A protein has these predicted regions:
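Active-site beta-loop-alpha junctions of metal-dependent nucleic acid enzymes
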Residues: 96-97, 147-172
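Two-metal-ion RNase H-like nuclease active-site motif
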Residues: 112-126, 135-137, 181
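Helix-centered, glycine/charged polyanion-binding patches within enzymatic domains
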Residues: 11, 23, 183-184, 188-245
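C-terminal domain-tail junction helix/linker
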Residues: 241-300
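Short, basic alpha-helical nucleic acid-contact segments in DNA-binding proteins
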Residues: 85, 93-112
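Basic, short loop/linker segments at the boundary and entry of helix-turn-helix/winged-helix-like folds
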Residues: 1-65, 83-87, 112
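DNA-recognition alpha helix
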Residues: 71-84
């Protein structure tokens, strides 16, 4: 160190140009740590025990998801409009069975994000405690590419969601992605862990903070943040009638059906079509019939 440098250091001992110790992080995650929350695998056996027709199941899902009614409201509408008598527990059983069947098929058919995507988490209430639902949405297709639920906002559920959306890093070594996010530190840790075994970064995190643009990054990627905030509001529309969930499994079931509905059944206003068209659903306008076809396709 030269005399001039020593004098600068004495004048400001916190000068980063003379920092002698640096923090280094290395992440060690097992694949079992990165599993996203999903329903149990009892769906086919549950659905085989359903005494009603698939059309009735489609009606239940149409009221429960498309319209956003609670299980008790769904029961009352089925009785008052269609003369179908089901208990609210039967409604929940149909929802649970359908979610368990659709979930594996949904994971196989989630699209990989394009060059630009956004990630965010939103809170839900489970057993009177705060939990979190995580989403990754693609800018171009407007499709949900990854989702997860957890009881914390830590790095592990954030990384699991990124793995669910992008797949393992080895499959993306020659690709580069931009992921817009908020200022939650878990995203930085998750992105660093995802990139750590690659010679070059695969995912570049872009932090968009606040409601107004106070920096160039926020201004450039504000549209991505707004995209996922709109997704969160749509999700909240479906969770609000429940006034919280009595169990984590109930929250998982609804979220699985929501992602399936959002990607494959719900027309997006800016696209004038669903984010991911399914040939079998072409020109099928009946909501119950759409759900019936989707369940049969997932169970095949």
């Amino acid at each position: 160190m030269t005399p001039a440098e020593r004098k600068r250091l004495e004048a400001n001992i916190y000068d980063p140009n003379f920092k002698l110790h640096y923090q280094y992080r290395e992440y060690h995650f097992h694949s079992s740590d990165l599993k996203c929350a999903r329903p149990d695998s009892a769906g086919p056996s549950l659905l085989s025990s359903i005494r009603s027709s698939y059309h009735t199941v489609g009606l239940v899902l149409s009221l429960f998801m498309n319209v956003g009614l609670s299980s008790r409201q769904t029961r009352e509408v089925l009785k008052g409009l269609f003369g179908i008598r089901l208990s609210h527990q039967t409604v929940l059983n149909y929802v649970k069975a359908s979610a368990a069947i659709i979930a594996p098929w949904l994971d196989r058919n989630l699209p990989k994000p394009g060059h630009r995507a956004a990630a965010d988490e939103t809170y839900i209430t489970v057993e009177d405690e705060q939990h979190y639902t995580w989403f990754v949405i693609d800018e171009l297709t407007r499709a949900i590419c990854g989702y997860n639920l957890s009881n914390t906002r830590g790095a592990v559920p954030a990384l699991a969601t990124i793995y669910n959306a992008y797949g393992p890093p080895e499959s993306n070594l020659h690709r580069r992605f931009i992921l817009a996010k908020d200022g939650l530190g878990s995203y930085n840790n998750a992105i660093m862990a995802y990139n750590q075994h690659s010679d070059r970064n695969i995912i570049f995190g872009k932090t968009v903070v606040g409601l107004s643009n106070h920096d160039d990054v926020s201004e450039k990627y504000r549209s991505l943040k707004q995209l996922i905030e709109r997704l969160n509001r749509t999700y909240k529309f479906h969770t609000r009638p429940r006034a919280g969930f009595k169990s984590m499994s109930g929250a998982i079931d609804l979220t699985v059906l929501f992602v399936a509905y959002y990607n494959f059944l719900r027309t997006h206003s800016s696209l004038h079509s669903v984010p991911i068209p399914i040939p079998e659903l072409h020109n099928i306008e009946s909501f119950p019939k759409q759900w019936e076809i989707l369940i049969r396709k997932a169970a095949a």
